[in-house]
């Protein structure tokens, strides 16, 4: 992970083949993509760099809508799935293994980092990534990203993040339990995962791990973006409704390169 000290979920590496089963919800993806499309259309965006593309949740959705898209991700495992999806869907996209903090791909009308991706970066690395995003945008280009809202992380909200799910794929059963806790002083949300993998004729396999997300208030994000030569155009709930700074759990920020 290099400079990143917060860690990643096991579904980014050891359990990558189960990422889409355990970490994605198509209805949620479609809602996000509709709002992202609305923003991009408003600013007449044609080219999009998804700097944390994962298995392609936004990448392929935007490609189908007619955008020229390029995907970058730090995980070779998730990119492997994205490449297979590209073949299956017959959607040709450029996919690059790289790091939002330092990879330079070109000049795009917009860059996106979705699904709390920036939370895996320390505050210092987040600012480094913003400066690199700036380098990958045309003049006036957009940066669109989401992250949990620190102000909305009440005790009840943390409890509601808990997961206890079971999924079945072929002859494999996967049980995923997750609980989280927050340090409100430093804005770090730590999640504790337990995965139980049951394959036919094999002994159950149990994997435990933890990872931390650095989260922010809306005000913090505005200050950081301005400090790194971005103009904040708007902040919203992830579904496109008005941001409530003390209540919105997952906020989406739209900024313009200045």
Descriptions of predicted regions:
Residues 212-258:
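C-terminal lobe and adjacent flexible extensions of AdoMet/dcAdoMet transferase-like proteins
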Residues 127-139:
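A short glycine-rich, Lys/Arg-flanked "PGG" loop and its adjoining helix->strand segment in the class I
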Residues 147-219:
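SAM-dependent methyltransferase
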Residues 101-110:
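A short acidic, Gly/Pro-enriched loop at the edge of an enzyme's catalytic core
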Residues 56-102:
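Class I SAM-dependent methyltransferase SAM/SAH-binding core
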Residues 1-54:
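Conserved class I S-adenosyl-L-methionine
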Residues 140-147:
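Conserved beta-strand signature within the Rossmann-like core of class I S-adenosyl-L-methionine
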